[in-house]
């Protein structure tokens, strides 16, 4: 299920656009996640009280968390599938401390794709979208495998 060198190049090229505005992209991804899947808010004590997209947009904590999420994901993507060292602590914290189900990782992957389509439609054609979808699926599958090792049924 790995990606070709060409697919990784597509992923990292579009990710460069994300890194040019981590705060904006991160905020948009989390707002999309929380509005499309409100049940995900229950996992975030800091954000549970945010009920509207406008409230979310005004939250500095949400913006900071968006940067944290996309910074971690960017570090994983740059490893081009050789991300064992990055995945292990992330899976550990998301399984044991935060108890984030794999389904929610699918939801945030959908949110990332949606935001990239909206912000970079000219640079996010079917080839780039397909490569990014594969990269995010690889990430989710590897997190799910670690969850299983940890005995987390997320």
From Swiss-Prot:
The keyword Methyltransferase does not apply. It is found in: Cytoplasm, Sarcoplasm. GO terms for biological process: removal of superoxide radicals. Keywords: Cytoplasm, Heme, Iron, Metal-binding, Muscle protein, Oxidoreductase, Oxygen transport, Phosphoprotein, Transport. Residues 2-148 form the Globin domain. GO terms for cellular component: extracellular exosome; sarcoplasm. Its EC number is 1.7.-.-, 1.11.1.-. The modification Phosphoserine is found at residue 4. Its main location: cytoplasm. It is an enzyme of class 1 (oxidoreductase). Monomeric. Monomeric heme protein which primary function is to store oxygen and facilitate its diffusion within muscle tissues. Reversibly binds oxygen through a pentacoordinated heme iron and enables its timely and efficient release as needed during periods of heightened demand. Depending on the oxidative conditions of tissues and cells, and in addition to its ability to bind oxygen, it also has a nitrite reductase activity whereby it regulates the production of bioactive nitric oxide. PANTHER family: MYOGLOBIN (PTHR47132:SF1). This is Myoglobin. It comes from Otolemur crassicaudatus (Brown greater galago).
């Amino acid at each position: 299920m790995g990606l070709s060198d060409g697919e990784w190049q597509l992923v990292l090229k579009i990710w460069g656009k994300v890194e040019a505005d981590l705060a904006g992209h991160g905020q948009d991804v989390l707002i999309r996640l929380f509005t499309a899947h409100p049940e995900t808010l229950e996992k975030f004590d800091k954000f549970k009280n945010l009920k509207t997209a406008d409230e979310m947009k005004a939250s500095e904590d949400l913006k900071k968390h968006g940067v944290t999420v996309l910074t971690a994901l960017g570090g994983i993507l740059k490893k081009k599938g050789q991300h064992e060292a990055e995945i292990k602590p992330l899976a550990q914290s998301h399984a044991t401390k935060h108890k984030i189900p794999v389904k929610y990782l699918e939801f945030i992957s959908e949110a990332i794709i949606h935001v990239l389509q909206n912000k970079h439609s000219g640079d996010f054609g079917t080839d780039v979208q397909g490569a990014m979808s594969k990269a995010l699926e690889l990430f989710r599958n590897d997190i799910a495998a670690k969850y299983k090792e940890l005995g987390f049924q997320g």
